[in-house]
A protein has these predicted regions:
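Conserved HGGG/HGGXW glycine-rich cap/lid loop of the alpha/beta-hydrolase fold
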Residues: 12-63
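Active-site nucleophile elbow and catalytic-triad environment of alpha/beta-hydrolase enzymes
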Residues: 151-166
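Short alpha-helix in the alpha/beta-hydrolase fold that links the catalytic acid
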Residues: 172, 186-194
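Catalytic histidine-centered segment of alpha/beta-hydrolase-like enzymes
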Residues: 208-219
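Short beta-strand/loop motif that positions the catalytic acidic residue
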Residues: 170, 176-178
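Acidic catalytic loop of the alpha/beta-hydrolase fold
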Residues: 181-185, 211
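Flexible "cap/lid" loop of the alpha/beta hydrolase fold
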Residues: 101-108, 113-143
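Active-site loop/oxyanion-hole signature of alpha/beta-hydrolase fold enzymes
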Residues: 43, 53-92, 219-223
Length: 233
């Protein structure tokens, strides 16, 4: 059964969509999308799990605060903290694209809080300042494509190398899913994560595009996530 619950963090309201019961799995979507992108995966997993899909600020049914500070990585991580603390037991984070970066950032800055992490078509950011600025410049050029206000799209910008610098220290079990037909930068990032993280496993899904969890590979991804969670200690 699908249940909607609003969580408030420092006057910021976050819509969450909850299904099922059991060991919790929290889903974090990418920029310009919403919790609905995980509907198929969450519905399948809700047979044995509590699934919680989050609308980030300014996305889906979560209002868009006027304060630009709501659209920073640290604010997003604080939002996740409140959602995770509302659960009865530690969760597994599943994040796509920007959501995957946030899941990695959470594991990097809050060791031991979550049971595991699953990332789909994402990367850990950039250590090279020039690469970061190149990413940020491209993000700014393409803001209009994401269908969100400029202040909301600020969430996609990179400002430091916190995640890159701490990859080797992330002891949290991590499943890295990459679409075989997504852009090469994501397959490169997936390989990098598997090499640098102490407990990461890479799976490449043939024919999968950037949003493969929404349609073509939803059932396969749900099975991979279920098996991953079942294997956690």
């Amino acid at each position: 059964m699908r249940r909607r619950r609003v969580v408030t963090v420092k006057d910021v309201q976050l819509n969450t969509v909850r299904r099922g019961a059991g060991a919790p799995i929290v889903f974090i979507h990418g920029l310009g999308t919403s919790a609905a992108t995980f509907d198929a995966c969450a519905t399948a997993l809700a047979e044995h799990h509590l699934t919680v899909a989050v609308d980030l600020p300014g996305h889906g049914d979560s209002p868009s605060p006027e304060d630009t500070e709501a659209f920073t990585r640290d604010a997003a991580l604080a939002d996740l903290d409140v959602i995770l603390e509302s659960l009865d037991e530690p969760a597994v984070l599943v994040g796509h694209s920007l959501g995957g970066y946030l899941a990695l950032a959470h594991a990097a800055t809050r060791p031991g809080v979550v049971r595991g992490v699953v990332v789909l078509n994402t990367g850990p950011g950039f250590r090279d300042p020039d690469k970061r600025e190149e990413w940020n410049a491209r993000s700014r050029r393409n803001w209009h494509r994401f269908g969100v206000p400029e202040r909301v799209a600020e969430l996609n910008l990179q400002h430091d190398a916190v995640v890159m610098d701490r990859l080797a220290d992330i002891a949290t079990a991590t499943l890295v899913l990459v679409g075989g037909d997504d852009r090469p930068e994501f397959s490169g990032a997936g390989n990098y994560l598997e090499r640098k993280m102490p407990d990461a496993r890479l799976v490449v899904l043939d024919g999968g595009g950037h949003s493969m969890h929404e349609d073509s590979h939803a059932a396969e991804i749900a099975t991979l996530v279920a098996d991953f969670v079942a294997g956690l200690h």
